[in-house]
């Protein structure tokens, strides 16, 4: 159940991130609301990730470092998401942080799929 909640929160977070990205920069009440929902999803993503690690990740020998690395990468992804939205809202260049978000998101997702708790695609 925890894995599904975590992945659902990530999928919703990424979808709403792109909605907020499209709305950012406009003085629109909807843009602020979507951005706040994305921030709430950040907290849910972090909470479910920590819960997954505490409940099962700590008990799997040989993967502790990879789980810690995935948590750090996940927090970096969230940081890049937030920096992208804030920079876009302020009218600054978002190319670098958007590329960073995409790279870190891909690496984090691939690492998550490789680890034993996630879905086993590899």
From Swiss-Prot:
Topology in the lipid bilayer: Multi-pass membrane protein
Cell location: Cell membrane
InterPro entries named among the record's database cross-references: UPF0344
Keywords assigned: Cell membrane, Membrane, Transmembrane, Transmembrane helix
Superkingdom, natural source: Bacteria
Transmembrane portions of the chain: 5-25, 33-53, 60-80, 93-113
Disulfide bonds, paired cysteine numbers: none
Predominant cellular place of this UniProt entry's protein: membrane
An annotated GO cellular component: plasma membrane
One Pfam family in the UniProt entry: DUF1516
Family per similarity comment: Belongs to the UPF0344 family.
Protein name: UPF0344 protein BPUM_1008
Lineage of the organism: Bacteria, Bacillati, Bacillota, Bacilli, Bacillales
